[in-house]
Each structure stands twice: as structure tokens, then as C-alpha cells.
Swiss-Prot record:
Provenance organism: Drosophila pseudoobscura pseudoobscura (Fruit fly)
One example GO MF annotation: GPI anchor binding
Protein name: UPAR/Ly6 domain-containing protein qvr
PANTHER family (alphabetical): ATILLA, ISOFORM B-RELATED-RELATED (PTHR33562), PROTEIN QUIVER (PTHR33562:SF31)
Organism placement in taxonomy: Eukaryota, Metazoa, Ecdysozoa, Arthropoda, Hexapoda
Family: Belongs to the quiver family.
UniProt entry tagged with the keyword Disulfide bond: yes
Topology class, membrane: Lipid-anchor; GPI-anchor
Modified how: N-glycosylated probably on Asn-58.
Length: 159
């Protein structure tokens, strides 16, 4: 009896997880494509000259006490560089960069020296975040964990 219930629960969890996984795989690339086709707002600042640009970003500050926003036809960018004992943060739009890369949303690239990184995102004011992971990627991680747990439960209940 327990084995039959275990199989039913494991199969049910696996089916639900597969459905969410499929939806997520369709949803995330569509969100990434939006970065290239619509205008978004990005913070534009440099912590070297504007203390409001530093991490952690003050989300509770009034708009006038936050760094300026700019309209962006691309992705928002956050660059972090460690110079001597100081962390320098720069927030901007990809249209200001002189690079020709295929832009992939919610990706961070480490500097070859290991002294900094550059992250890209495609939601309004997303470059204010300390880590530029979107809810979609958090959802994808949760789904991956759920698949692993449901498989493990199925294995344990089938013994």
C-alpha cells in the first residue's frame, strides 16, 4: 500500500514539476527578448562621484534622493570594480557601452583579473539590485530543486 501511494505522490510531483519547468523554459527566453524591443528605465550613476550609487542601494529613499534614471533601449548594466580597498559601482544602459556582444539577460561576467564583474538585466530599475537575479531565474532554481526532490522522494518511496 505504501509503495502504491509513494508512486502516486512521486508521479504527481514529477508531473507538476515538469509542467512548471516547461512554462519557465518558455517564459524566461521571452523576457530576455523584451530587452531588445522595448524601453526600460535604468539608473545612471558612478559611486566614485555619487555616494547614492553604492551598494547596498537605498530602496526606501525618496526618488529625489536616488541616482538619476535614464530611458534605455537595451539592457541595464551594473559594473562593480574593486580598486585598492574601495568598491566602485557604476550603473548605466548598454547603449552607453562600446561593446558588440550578444546580450543575454541576467548574466554576470567576471573581469579577467578577478577585480570586478559586469551584470546585465532587462527590467525597470533592475540595476539597483545588489545581485541582478530575476524572479524568473529564482523560479527556475526552485523548479530544478523541486524536480530533484521529487525524484529523490520517488526513489525512496519505491524501495
Amino acid at each position: 500500500m505504501w509503495k502504491e501511494k509513494g508512486n502516486a505522490i512521486g508521479n504527481w510531483l514529477l508531473a507538476i514539476t515538469a509542467i512548471f519547468g516547461f512554462i519557465t523554459l518558455i517564459w524566461i527566453p521571452q523576457a530576455s527578448a523584451e530587452c531588445q524591443t522595448r524601453s526600460i528605465y535604468c539608473y545612471e550613476c558612478d559611486s566614485w562621484t555619487d555616494a547614492r550609487c553604492k551598494d547596498p542601494f537605498n530602496y526606501t529613499a525618496l526618488p529625489r534622493d536616488q541616482p538619476p534614471l535614464m530611458t534605455c533601449n537595451g539592457c541595464c548594466v551594473k559594473m562593480v570594480r574593486h580598486q585598492r580597498s574601495r568598491e566602485v559601482v557604476r550603473r548605466m544602459c548598454t547603449s552607453q557601452l562600446q561593446i558588440n556582444l550578444f546580450m543575454v539577460d541576467h548574466v554576470c561576467m567576471m573581469e579577467s583579473s578577478g577585480n570586478g564583474h559586469m551584470c546585465f538585466c532587462e527590467e525597470d530599475m533592475c540595476n539597483s539590485s545588489k545581485d541582478l537575479y530575476s524572479h524568473g531565474h529564482q523560479l527556475h532554481l526552485i523548479i530544478t530543486i523541486a524536480v530533484a526532490v521529487s525524484w529523490l522522494m520517488g526513489q525512496l518511496l519505491n524501495r
